[in-house]
């Protein structure tokens, strides 16, 4: 809390007045990050609604959020147990917002059209894979987003 107060330019007493404990502060940070990443994804899809690139747009918005907000990702490294629990807790709400954005594009995927997966299951799988990059970072978020969007689950295997 001392470091946070110093970084914010406020006294520890003021910080404790608003947040009480480190856990309350972390929860407030997590809630803000959850809201902002959801908004970033929704805004990215609104700016580029083409279904042909929808998966890449969603994944890239997630990755770029991390790049644009490195302090949010620092919390993941400083408090990994809290971060894992927070992501686990937030994932259902994130999925509820983002799945409807992905489903129209995923309905065109060969794995969905063949009946191997539902569009909702494929959306959840993609979002879970993308979420792991918050713990195993990449120096090339754009390339990673393109790699995930190019999965055979979405486009079929080279032999199909």
Role assignments for model-derived ranges:
Residues 1-24, 28:
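Helix-turn-helix
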Residues 7, 24-46, 57-61, 96-100:
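Alpha-helical structural segments
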Residues 21-24, 50, 71:
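Residue-level recognition of oxygen-bearing side chains
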Residues 35-38, 83-113, 117-124:
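Amphipathic alpha-helical packing segments from all-alpha helical-bundle domains
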Residues 52-67, 120, 124, 145-149:
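Amphipathic alpha-helical segments that line or abut small-molecule/effector binding pockets
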Residues 64-68, 104, 108, 124-143, ...:
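Amphipathic C-terminal alpha-helical segment
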Residues 66-91:
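Amphipathic alpha-helical segments used for helix-helix packing
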